Amino acid sequence: MASRVSAASQFAVYGPTFLDVVMGPLDGPPVPGREAWVEGALMCAGGAANQAIALARLGAPVRLHTRLGVDQMGQFVDEMLAREGVDTSSCERVGDQNVTVSLSFDGDRAMTTRGTTALPRLGGDAPACLLADVRGISANSEVVSSWRERGTWVLADTAWDEAGAWDTADLEALRVADVCTPNEEEALAYARTDSVEDAARWFASFGCDCVVTCGKNGVVACVDGQILRVPAPAVRA
């Protein structure tokens, strides 16, 4: 476990955590009954744990609020978080670890997941910053509102709508956020537009800045009413 620091100086990350098994790059999607060989493969902590580790590597004190499995796969994730200096004292221990297999091809990823998005309730002292998705913020609205009144800066991610309804009522949590980060598909679907720039402006109408992530095409942001476009750096998938 990471050394404890005061909550007021911490980044709190809230969301489901996964053991990610990542392989690629593939020339195309897998073909049933055939074996495809790739150059790269790794196992890492994904989901909220990935965000927590990224912040820890930047030198930020991080507290992760999530569920971690007590099985072998969960122990692997727990050990990785400990090595990275992430505070897991607020994590709930459950039987099975969430697992995702991620395959990279055509400049993006295809994922298959076993597990659940269920999470423990938020609580405790207000952190300096909170990273969570809109569902997590909505489920803990009283706590998040209380934290924000005490100065917590809130980053809200959006969530894929499996039902395809894209109900804007699901985004009410953005009204207590400082910035939101939908991906391109989510942004276009919620805003009912085919323009990423217009979608970014629409999300900003909730009262927060918006950064739309566009995969290999970088990001489009609406900050203080201005549209900014930033290309993605070249990296190996």
Regions found by a protein language model. Name each.
Residues 1-65, 75, 231, 236-237:
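Glycine-rich phosphate/adenosyl-contacting loop at the front of the ribokinase-like
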Residues 95-98:
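Short acidic/glycine-enriched loop/turn segments that link adjacent beta-strands
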Residues 2-17, 63, 79-93, 104-229:
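Ribokinase/PfkB-type carbohydrate-kinase core domain
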Residues 21-22, 72, 219-222:
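Short active-site-adjacent structural elements
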Residues 72-79:
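Short, mixed-charge aromatic SLiMs
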